[in-house]
């Protein structure tokens, strides 16, 4: 009797159970059509036959993404008015105005919850809608809808592109930043740097900031002012910076501090400005590489020696010692490629094997047409064929000189 054993590959992790039921028995079970497949995992299966030979087969296991779980219980959500700190309540801004001015930093309250990407992320209804925005309450860790939410419950990636006048949550940006550099931000420039203040000062402050903020996306660089408890975190993607700003607002790191997360102003350091200009140049160069043909890009970057030889031979256009400029050579190459593509799209023209015989009327006409009057010979022949041959032509009269012919002048200047 054959024996079967499953051998996990060395790099495979411990398999996780598939979510077959919701955590809440009363909640609906996730359907197969809503589930999105994750990258497949493989396992090696060893089978021993009766004769003792062992076979190894590779088994592909496709796992489904779990549904997004509710982060808070909807029954615990309460809409309480803010404490009275003034004399007039503004219903539009939901706060009090007037009275004694309070300290805007000491009056901050810690966030009630925090998003846990490893446990809270999953598929929602927004995964079926292209161009959906991310859930703001999910980033803050207080979304009660779970997989029934109309927004995305995951981290932004490089493939999530939005209009420059809105952020990743779908909120409209403004032409300028607020005075405190908070809020949504501005659409005048791409800001990927966050200002993080009120950090508890320790010796390992850079490691603590990196560990907590790396959860929200890939970090480009971190600059820490240890003595002041301030850090500047720069992400590689602007959408991740927007997500991290909302996720870490009023949160704490390893101590009980309440963070002050804002947008960073323009760095006055010349090295930082050069670094940003170099990054923009690299983005422009990447856009040019995608627009040009791959052969031409490889030739410009010197990665294709055969292309250099081809340009040296064919780029002279038959003129010895002539080297065509890059724009001329590229225009000629593009023209040939367009002609080749047009030839592939259009059907080839079929040549006729038998030429059509000339018509009797055209055969009777002389090979040379002489203008003997107002109409040419071919026109007269056509008119004769229509009128039955009763067409007469006359030559155009020669204009006479008139009374001024042989006119003599008495002036001696003749």
Curated annotation (Swiss-Prot):
GO cellular component, one term: U2-type catalytic step 1 spliceosome
Localization (cell): Nucleus
Domain RRM, first and last residues per copy: 192-266
Region described as Disordered: 1-86, 351-372, 390-414
Keyword line: Cell cycle, Metal-binding, mRNA processing, mRNA splicing, Nucleus, RNA-binding, Spliceosome, Zinc, Zinc-finger
Domain of life: Eukaryota
Ranges annotated as biased composition (Low complexity): 356-369
Pfam families according to UniProt: RRM_1, Torus
Zinc finger (C3H1-type): 130-156
Any GO BP annotation: positive regulation of cell cycle
Biased composition (Polar residues): 34-51
Annotated Basic residues bias: 55-68
Gene Ontology MF term list: pre-mRNA binding; U6 snRNA binding; zinc ion binding
Annotated InterPro entries: Cwc2/Slt11, Cwc2_RRM, Nucleotide-bd_a/b_plait_sf, RBD_domain_sf, RRM_dom, Torus, Znf_CCCH, Znf_CCCH_sf
Function per UniProt: Involved in the first step of pre-mRNA splicing. Required for cell growth and cell cycle control. Plays a role in the levels of the U1, U4, U5 and U6 snRNAs and the maintenance of the U4/U6 snRNA complex. May provide the link between the 'nineteen complex' NTC spliceosome protein complex and the spliceosome through the U6 snRNA. Associates predominantly with U6 snRNAs in assembled active spliceosomes. Binds directly to the internal stem-loop (ISL) domain of the U6 snRNA and to the pre-mRNA intron near the 5' splice site during the activation and catalytic phases of the spliceosome cycle.
UniProt comment concerning the protein's domains: The C-terminal RRM domain and the zinc finger motif are necessary for RNA-binding.
Assembly behavior: Associated with the spliceosome.
Similarity comment text for this entry: Belongs to the RRM CWC2 family.
Name of the protein this chain belongs to: Pre-mRNA-splicing factor cwc2
């Amino acid at each position: 009797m054959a024996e079967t054993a499953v051998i996990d590959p060395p790099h495979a992790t411990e398999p996780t159970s598939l979510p077959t039921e919701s955590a809440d028995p009363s909640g609906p079970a996730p359907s197969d059509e809503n589930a999105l497949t994750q990258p497949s995992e493989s396992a090696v299966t060893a089978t021993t036959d009766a004769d003792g030979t062992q076979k190894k087969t590779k088994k592909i296991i496709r796992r489904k993404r779990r549904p997004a779980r509710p982060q808070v219980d909807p029954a615990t959500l309460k809409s309480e008015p803010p404490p009275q700190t003034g004399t007039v309540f503004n219903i539009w801004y939901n706060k009090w105005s007037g009275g004694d001015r309070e300290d805007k930093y000491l009056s901050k309250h810690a966030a009630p919850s925090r998003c846990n990407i490893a446990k809270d992320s999953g598929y929602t209804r927004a995964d079926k809608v292209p161009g959906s925005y991310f859930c703001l309450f999910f980033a803050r860790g207080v979304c009660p809808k779970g997989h029934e939410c109309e927004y995305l419950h995951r981290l932004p990636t490089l493939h999530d592109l939005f209009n420059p006048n809105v952020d990743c949550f779908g909120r409209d940006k403004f032409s300028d930043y607020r005075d405190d550099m908070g809020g949504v931000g501005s659409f005048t420039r791409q800001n990927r740097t966050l200002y993080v203040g009120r950090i508890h000062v320790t010796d390992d402050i850079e490691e603590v900031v990196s560990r907590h903020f790396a959860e929200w996306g890939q970090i480009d660089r971190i600059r820490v002012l240890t003595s002041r408890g301030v850090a500047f975190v720069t992400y590689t993607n602007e959408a991740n910076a927007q997500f991290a700003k909302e996720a870490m607002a009023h949160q704490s790191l390893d101590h009980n501090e309440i963070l002050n997360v804002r947008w960073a102003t323009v760095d006055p350091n010349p090295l930082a400005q050069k670094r940003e200009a170099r990054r923009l140049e690299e983005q422009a160069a990447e856009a040019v590489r995608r627009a040009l043909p791959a052969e031409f890009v490889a030739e410009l970057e010197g990665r294709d020696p055969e292309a250099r030889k081809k340009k040296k031979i064919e780029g002279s256009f038959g003129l010895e010692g002539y080297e065509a400029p890059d724009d001329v050579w590229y225009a000629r190459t593009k023209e040939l490629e367009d002609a080749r593509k047009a030839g592939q799209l259009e059907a080839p023209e079929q040549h006729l094997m038998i030429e059509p015989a000339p018509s009797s009327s055209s055969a009777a006409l002389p090979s040379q047409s002489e203008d003997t009057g107002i109409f040419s010979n071919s026109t007269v022949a056509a008119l004769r064929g229509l009128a039955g041959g009763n067409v007469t032509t006359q030559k155009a009269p020669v204009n006479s000189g008139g009374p001024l012919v042989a006119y003599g002048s008495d002036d001696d200047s003749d």
